[in-house]
């Protein structure tokens, strides 16, 4: 049970970091585009952040 709690805490922490990085990238994109971000860019950033978080979690446990 303790290892499950540690694993969930780690996944939450990695997810929080990924979302933070995604927001920073979005802010940089807004500055480049004059404040305009398309829906496609938002989806791409979110999906890449989720994929990075999953890869980090799998490499940690694998």
Curated annotation (Swiss-Prot):
Expressed by the skin glands. Keywords: Amphibian defense peptide, Antibiotic, Antimicrobial, Cleavage on pair of basic residues, Immunity, Innate immunity, Secreted, Signal. Residues 1-22 form the signal peptide. The keyword Membrane does not apply. Pfam families: FSAP_sig_propep. The keyword RNA-binding does not apply. Its main location: secreted. It is found in: Secreted. Coiled coil: none annotated. Residues 23-44 form a propeptide. GO terms for biological process: defense response to bacterium; innate immune response. One of its GO terms (cellular component) is extracellular region. Mainly adopts a combination conformation of random and beta-sheet. Belongs to the frog skin active peptide (FSAP) family. Amolopin subfamily. Antimicrobial peptide with activity against Gram-positive bacteria. Has been tested against S.aureus (MIC=37.5 ug/mL), against B.pumilus (MIC=75.0 ug/mL), B.cereus (no activity detected). Does not show activity against Gram-negative bacteria (E.coli, B.dysenteriae, A.calcoaceticus, P.aeruginosa) and fungi (C.albicans). Does not show hemolytic activity against rabbit erythrocytes. This is Amolopin-P2. The lineage of its organism: Eukaryota, Metazoa, Chordata, Craniata, Vertebrata.
């Amino acid at each position: 049970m303790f290892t499950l709690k540690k694993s969930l805490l780690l996944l939450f922490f990695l997810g929080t970091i990924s979302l933070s990085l995604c927001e920073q990238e979005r802010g940089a994109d807004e500055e480049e585009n004059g404040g305009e971000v398309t829906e496609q860019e938002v989806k791409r950033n979110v999906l890449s952040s989720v994929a990075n978080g999953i890869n980090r979690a799998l490499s940690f446990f694998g």
